[in-house]
């Protein structure tokens, strides 16, 4: 606060998030959900994720994974020009960074099944047994071993779809009174946006 007429403030907020989720292709039938009860112990079988598992180093993994962080910073100026008029201005920036995982595979196994489809944990409402551990988790270590043993490159791979955006803006609002019954509001709103989306 410079004086009674001018106030300046700076704000910033943001919360990184990540989550694993089930693919649209990983839905189970009622019979399929009941079949995974033994994997969930005393928890609801409907929390089961057919592609949840652990990587070669014990890290948690899912064929469908998302991470994103979009903090916003704002510099605000409030000017009380006189008893009737004021000007409120905010300059802000928002930088978004994140990605989503997706399983890839372009070859077929001996049975003619494409490796890309093996990333889906279920088929027609039933749980798949491809790369399935005895505890119901998806066996990412087995996929890694298969890729290492291949003479023709990786049979199955995880790709990242990267989403980046930059927002820059200026918002200013002028307010004044004309007499006792008329309020006037006017302002400007400038915005620059650039987004980059890559795989």
Model-inferred region functions:
Residues 14-18, 93-97, 190-196:
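Transmembrane beta-strands of outer-membrane beta-barrel pores
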Residues 57-102, 154-183, 196-197:
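Outer-membrane beta-barrel transmembrane strands
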Residues 5-74, 101-157:
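Acidic/polar loop-and-plug regions of large Gram-negative outer-membrane beta-barrel proteins
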Residues 1-3:
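Feature captures outer-membrane beta-barrel proteins of Gram-negative bacteria and organelles
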Residues 8-12, 87-91, 184-188:
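Transmembrane beta-strands of outer-membrane beta-barrel proteins
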Residues 5, 165, 183, 189-191:
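Structural signature of Gram-negative outer-membrane beta-barrels, strongest in the C-terminal barrel
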């Amino acid at each position: 606060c410079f004086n009674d007429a001018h106030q300046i403030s700076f704000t910033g907020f943001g919360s990184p998030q990540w989550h694993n989720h089930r693919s649209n292709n990983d839905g189970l039938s009622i019979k399929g959900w009941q079949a995974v009860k033994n994997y969930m112990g005393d928890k609801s079988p409907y929390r089961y994720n057919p592609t949840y598992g652990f990587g070669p180093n014990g890290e948690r993994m899912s064929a469908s994974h998302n991470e994103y962080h979009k903090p916003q910073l704002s510099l605000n100026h409030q000017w009380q020009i006189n008893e009737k008029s004021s000007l409120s201005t905010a300059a802000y920036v928002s930088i978004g960074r994140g990605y989503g995982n997706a399983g890839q595979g372009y070859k077929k196994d001996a049975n003619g099944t494409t490796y890309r489809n093996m990333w889906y944990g279920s088929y027609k409402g039933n749980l798949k047994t491809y790369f399935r551990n005895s505890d119901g988790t998806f066996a990412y270590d087995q996929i890694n071993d298969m890729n290492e043993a291949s003479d023709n490159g990786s049979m199955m791979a995880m790709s990242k779809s990267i989403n980046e955006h930059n927002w820059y803006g200026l918002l200013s609002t002028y307010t004044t009174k004309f007499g006792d019954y008329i309020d006037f509001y006017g302002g400007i709103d400038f915005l620059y946006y650039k987004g980059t989306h890559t795989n």
